[in-house]
Amino acid sequence: IADMQREGLIRHVGLSEVSVEQIKIAQQYFTVASVQNRYNLVDRFSEDVLDYCESQNIAFIPWFPLAAGSLANEGSVLDEVAKRLGAAPAQVALAWVLKRSSVMLPIPGTSKVKHLEENVAAASIVLSDEDFAALDAAGKAEWNKTQA
């Protein structure tokens, strides 16, 4: 891969489902343009990878970025923020992902035009620092439950 990149046959190299250590090893051989790991409001397994990508200015592409687990339930923090903003919970979950890091590049999958339109509109949702922190805390608490 490194030789092909040097020869111009490959312009950019991305990695998927890797650890920080694996990224560092890859960086010894070629420039890493992006990392695609599972990450969302409640799945924080790749938190350290995202932080490392941010420090290295590597694009981070979260797969399954809309997952919110029980946070999407009626009366949850996510539900309350969504209602207050006049948005769908999935839009707020996506807005949280977008605000989380400047290197974040979510590409949520969808099979319906309505959901595509909602996903695009999520980019214009502005979360206050308080809403972001409340969602972050709720997501971490949910994540911690799954790790116990």
Q: Whereabouts are the PLM-identified features?
A:
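Beta/alpha (TIM)-barrel catalytic core signal, keyed to glycine-rich beta->alpha loops juxtaposed to Asp/Glu
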Residues: 1-148
